Amino acid sequence: MSDASQGLRLYNTLTRAKTDFVPIDALNVRMYVCGPTVYDFAHIGNARPVIVFDVLFRLLRHLYGQAHVTYVRNITDVDDKINARALRDFGSEISAGKLSLNEAIRRVTEKTADQFHRDVATLGCLEPTVEPRATEFVEPRADGKADMITLIQSLIKRGHAYAAAGEVLFDTASMPDYGQLSKRNLDEQQAGARVAVDAHKKNPGDFVLWKLSSPEEPGWQSPWGRGRPGWHIECSAMSAAYLGEVFDIHGGGLDLIFPHHENEIAQSRCAHGTSVMANVWMHNGFLQVEGQKMSKSLGNFYSIHELLETETFGGRSWPGEVLRLAMLMTHYREPIDFSVRKLEEAENTLRKWKRAADLAPAAGQLPVEVIDALSDDLATYAAFQVLTQLAGEAADGNEAAAALKASLLFLGFDVASADIDEDGVAKAIANRLALIAAKNWTEADRIRDELLAQGVQLKDGKDPVTGERITTWEVKR
């Protein structure tokens, strides 16, 4: 096992194997996860990757240090579904000339993105390091970060894309190993899964990089006329902008393997001339509701907001931390049956854990057994077995209760005690400042992460008079 792996093993969809995770640069671990397309409130299926990769983000920060992990999760705010929603919701105002389509689109995307942020915060998820919006990366940028138009130009120049019938398409036949992620070769490609077959395509599987916009539709000037990007090129640009041409981990739902992630790989590798886009590809399993596929036609389609704020599921609303635990009780790669019974089980389990954790006045050390379990391809079920054992051993003020409290905080559950050991925090801050002065960043980061696991958020600054580094803290709720 490489020292750089820190004992972490992850299942890689690309290789269909679980192997040691070795970052490209242990001081700059990089992860990209596909975020929401903001045309409608996120549904409970969307919640699963957000929660799963939040746990991985927390684990990576613990293993490599908070300052050494970059997590990018995008917002897709240009899409034909958004256009359709804007016309549906604001059609009369647009027809009356009171609102342009672009203004209506902005209202839809802002409202939906704001709700998404409220939802995921209630689910106990940390904010990603960066959250780029697709519309900010269409045209060449003043800061020189990757953009969609430049990537498309590179693909054309390298012989991997062509213009036809007002579109620019990726030539799948130009990439000999296209289909590597989904294990589909070109002979097996069938139309469907958001890949349209048209007469102007060289190959049935060729997909759109750029398409023309009507005068009313959102559009940007390009060498191929005023238009807008295809679905896949957006993530290739945003990941390259913040993580580089090759990075460590790319995540998302199982439904994105084909065509979205397959086409991301094709675009990025061919535009940059690299052998990979990301070294590890991770995908969470599908979600059913009460044993059936979630579908509006079946009447079992629920948004995160509905579960949190209304009584439409099980005749009651549900706390965000209950939804979080219910999602994590099943291994992320396995399918999950989301049911009232599962939520009730999660709520009862969480109640028992919290009751035991309350026996400790403050969080203790994070048990190595919890980290070991999570380091085995995010085996949350094994980590929860440790928590249940600690709950059984917990007594007033003992180590088991303190370790349980630390574990719950680390996993994103709010059990921070108001009774913080202030002297202990002060000593830890002093030690950290000494380590920073000695340029021992790794140990300084570890102290910060351990305090955060105990519910203590550090804030670094400078004394306005002396200019010396100072650190304040607050209880993170």
Curated annotation (Swiss-Prot):
Enzyme Commission (EC) number: 6.1.1.16
UniProt keyword list: Aminoacyl-tRNA synthetase, ATP-binding, Cytoplasm, Ligase, Metal-binding, Nucleotide-binding, Protein biosynthesis, Zinc
Location within or outside the cell: Cytoplasm
Name of the protein in question: Cysteine--tRNA ligase
CC terms in the record's Gene Ontology section: cytosol
Binding site for Zn(2+): 34, 235, 260, 264
Homology family: Belongs to the class-I aminoacyl-tRNA synthetase family.
Listed Pfam families: tRNA-synt_1e
Organism phylogeny: Bacteria, Pseudomonadati, Pseudomonadota, Alphaproteobacteria, Hyphomicrobiales
Reaction catalysis annotation: tRNA(Cys) + L-cysteine + ATP = L-cysteinyl-tRNA(Cys) + AMP + diphosphate
GO terms of biological process kind: cysteinyl-tRNA aminoacylation
Signal sequence, start to end: none
Subunit structure comment from the entry: Monomer.
Cofactor: how bound: Binds 1 zinc ion per subunit.
SUPFAM superfamilies referenced in this protein's UniProt entry, alphabetically: Anticodon-binding domain of a subclass of class I aminoacyl-tRNA synthetases (SSF47323), Nucleotidylyl transferase (SSF52374)
Domain of life: Bacteria
Binding site for ATP: 296
Single GO molecular function: zinc ion binding
Motif 'KMSKS' region boundaries: 293-297
Motif ('HIGH' region): 36-46
Annotated transmembrane regions: none
